[in-house]
Amino acid sequence: MSDVVKLETAPRDPRFPSTNQTMTCWVRYLEWKRCQSKDGEDSDECKKLRRWAYAMCPIDWVERWEEQQQDGTFPGPKFE
Amino acid sequence: MKFFFFSFINYKVLNDAARPWQIGFQDPATPIMEGIVNLHHDIIFFLIIIIIFVSWILFRTLFLFNSKTNPVAYNFSHGTFIELLWTLTPSLVLIGIAVPSFALLYSIDEIIDPAITIKAVGRQWYWSYEYSDYVNEENEFLAFHSYILPEEDLELGQFRLLEVDNRIIIPVNTHIRIIVTGADVIHSWAVPSLGVKCDAIPGRLNQISFFIKREGIYYGQCSEICGVNHGFMPIVIEAVSFDDYIRWVQNKILD
Ligand SMILES: [Cu+2]
């Protein structure tokens, strides 16, 4: 039961020390996407990066980017 | 229930919500708010001394050195010593204030590796919270909206315009990260007892962190004018013990 709730979240990122964390969210999301294209969806590393991306980004934002990835209108880099 | 004379001494009711005609602080629940209150009190102490000193000089000058008591005017216009004195003293006072003020400012910005991240999204006119560290069986995140309780639904003892239907539950003695953003216009997420106030700006994510030292219910309000219902989107934080928090999360992701 208690293994369902783990007290773990995205760590403090020394690259982004300020109050403005917009870039943390964006970079964490891209790191997750890069991992996905490299190691595949189900690797432990990618699952961790997915958690960290969702910890730093509003769910709406990630969902919008995922839609854009599908539609081919995503403004960020593409990892093949 | 037995009532002992003087037993009221044991009661200490802490003030975690605004009260009518309040001009002081609410009682602090985080080290940061304790720092803010202490800095304020320290500065006000010296401020009162300075006000008394300046008023005393001003009144002496006005009453003792007017045209009646001194019909012949002095003809000097400089005094190097006194000018040095009244330039250097205020600058030393300002430096004396700057040192603890900057120490506090930088300690507010300090981010310690948090255990929980909560996102607060300001909307017209309610707050949504996302606990995306936790998912249920269907891979859905723990997230909910937090609306004001209308006046007719209030129970005895609840606060008008401050109570919400879904409170944020947070464990005590844990480092918390809050990511604040807006979904439509600028709002501001503020809880006085925790010493936090952070603008919720669309397209930008702002991070604040705090460490609650005692269990309790903390009230705050949207603090950036955001439209007609700006005054009706309060914030309620319930700080509970760690075990209660885990239990709450489990119940929340099970249903
Ligand atoms: Cu607002």
UniProtKB/Swiss-Prot annotation, chain B:
Binds a dinuclear copper A center per subunit. Cu cation A2 binds at C222, E224, C226, H230. Residues 64-83 are mitochondrial matrix. Cu cation A1 binds at H187, C222, C226, M233. It is found in: Mitochondrion inner membrane. Residues 1-42, 105-255 are mitochondrial intermembrane. Its EC number is 7.1.1.9. Mg(2+) binds at E224. The chain crosses the membrane at residues 43-63, 84-104. It catalyses: 4 Fe(II)-[cytochrome c] + O2 + 8 H(+)(in) = 4 Fe(III)-[cytochrome c] + 2 H2O + 4 H(+)(out). Keywords: Copper, Electron transport, Magnesium, Membrane, Metal-binding, Mitochondrion, Mitochondrion inner membrane, Respiratory chain, Translocase, Transmembrane, Transmembrane helix, Transport. Belongs to the cytochrome c oxidase subunit 2 family. Component of the cytochrome c oxidase, the last enzyme in the mitochondrial electron transport chain which drives oxidative phosphorylation. The respiratory chain contains 3 multisubunit complexes succinate dehydrogenase (complex II, CII), ubiquinol-cytochrome c oxidoreductase (cytochrome b-c1 complex, complex III, CIII) and cytochrome c oxidase (complex IV, CIV), that cooperate to transfer electrons derived from NADH and succinate to molecular oxygen, creating an electrochemical gradient over the inner membrane that drives transmembrane transport and the ATP synthase. Component of the cytochrome c oxidase (complex IV, CIV), a multisubunit enzyme composed of a catalytic core of 3 subunits and several supernumerary subunits. The complex exists as a monomer or a dimer and forms supercomplexes (SCs) in the inner mitochondrial membrane with ubiquinol-cytochrome c oxidoreductase (cytochrome b-c1 complex, complex III, CIII). This is Cytochrome c oxidase subunit 2. It comes from Cyanidium caldarium (Red alga). The lineage of its organism: Eukaryota, Rhodophyta, Bangiophyceae, Cyanidiales, Cyanidiaceae.
